[in-house]
Amino acid sequence: MNKKTIVVKFGTSTLTQGSPKLNSPHMMEIVRQIAQLHNDGFRIVIVTSGAIAAGRHYLNHPQLPPTIASKQLLAAVGQSQLIQAWEKLFAIYDIHIGQLLLTRADIEDRERFLNARDTLHALLDNHIIPVINENDAVATAEIKVGDNDNLSALVAILVQAEQLYLLTDQQGLFDSDPRKNPEAKLIPVVEQITDHIRSIAGGSGTNLGTGGMMTKIIAADVATRSGIETIIAPGNRPNVIADLAYEQNIGTKFIAHQSDRLESRKQWLFAAPSAGIITIDDGAKNAILEQNKSLLPAGIINVEGRFSRGEVVKICTQSGKDIVLGMPRYNSDALQLIKGRKSADIENVLGYEYGAVAMHRDDMIILS
């Protein structure tokens, strides 16, 4: 079975098909494709816009002032309508979904990042499709052009996706605005996002959503720099999601920088000063440096500093040499209690557990 992880972002224009409300027949077709891929073994994550449009329709298009508070009102009302629409359609295929409402702060904060990542992986590991939206009802600065485009790129990094699909009402990126120039040509492949590519991206799209082509270019830049292939494609093309998953050439493909895949992610994760030091024994040092293993509690000798789960800390040897920069799965107080113990003892000692490792290999940068 193909275990490729794909994040699919649906803009408001894709879900409404130009109407003032969610287009149920089109959403049904979207769900059919995702259900097919889900059953074929793909791991699919949905990032969905549409809450504000759904709220506006549910309230019968109220006359509201063009303020942040009005958008938050519509988002608060519409979010429940949006998730119900997804839930009912996936239920036809006996597929469960799990809702996450995120803001950029949830991903930039180290501990909340780890919690969000663990939740997403738990959902995927249990064959539940995550459905993610920006938490527009409480976010202020985030309700602006590009929130869910950028969010989808960060989610793709979060779940270590191979691909990100940005589905929109356009065929892809053109060399000029196709709505103004009938001679505009589709750009099928972008090897690198240059100033020229940015200059032809244009402005915002529809008035129902908050995203435009430029925000998709920014999202593609974030994703490809982290080794994630990104495709801008037409959301109304028949079978577009399944065809993309099976490598058909549709829309505009942004080539991922695969050589920088892991390092890019880690640069993004670890741009912070060290909050503490974990000293380990020689066995743990050899396991990390020579066998590419994670750090187990049994290998920890000492913990210095006060830090939260997910903050950046150093791992050093008994001689004091720094060998790793990384994010622990447990805070400093918990590590003090479980250091030197077997992983099987974690839950008995703490009353909870975030897994068998103190720091996962994926959350480490090797310094030496």
Swiss-Prot record:
ATP binds at K9, T168, D169, T210, G211, G212, M213, M214, T215, K216. GO terms for biological process: L-proline biosynthetic process. The keyword Hydrolase does not apply. One of its GO terms (molecular function) is RNA binding. It is found in: Cytoplasm. It holds the Pfam family AA_kinase. It catalyses: L-glutamate + ATP = L-glutamyl 5-phosphate + ADP. Substrate binds at S49, D136, N148. This is Glutamate 5-kinase. It comes from Haemophilus influenzae (strain 86-028NP).
